[in-house]
């Protein structure tokens, strides 16, 4: 049996209990990660089936294209759009960075053709649900 197969029942149970604990959680895809909006600046909390707690903020590439083109047909490359997206994200990320890193989160940047996101993630142990709930509450407190 693979690790994924053995962890799926634990995830299914954890997912169900977390949705009871925090009814605002929603699935990003059926049976997959749970997500929760954090505050008004666009932060998102995500809990993944493989045991990661992620706080992230991102921008859709089409949104940044619209901001930069201001109605002109100028076509910017993906790299330039990604640089500009990170520039727009920096003020909000800078406010949260110290607290998240101090709490054991690792910072990363994810980029695709569709979006750019700054993520802060740390592992959580589904066997200790109280600790997972505490971590969720702490994250909510940082952004509300």
Where are these predicted regions, by residue range?
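Short, internal acidic amphipathic alpha-helical interface segments
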Residues: 60-119
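Short, surface-exposed, charge-dense and proline/glycine-enriched linear segments
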Residues: 53-66, 137-144
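Negatively charged, low-complexity tracts enriched in Asp/Glu with abundant Ser/Thr
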Residues: 2-31, 68-80, 129-142
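Residue-level detector of solvent-exposed, low-hydrophobicity positions
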Residues: 18, 32, 50, 95-96, ...
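Residues that cap or initiate secondary-structure elements
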Residues: 42, 61-65, 124-126
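A short, solvent-exposed beta-edge/loop patch
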Residues: 103-129, 133-142
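Well-ordered, non-membrane alpha-helical segments in soluble/globular domains
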Residues: 86-96, 132-143
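Charge-rich, low-complexity N-terminal segments
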Residues: 1-59, 87, 97, 101-104, ...
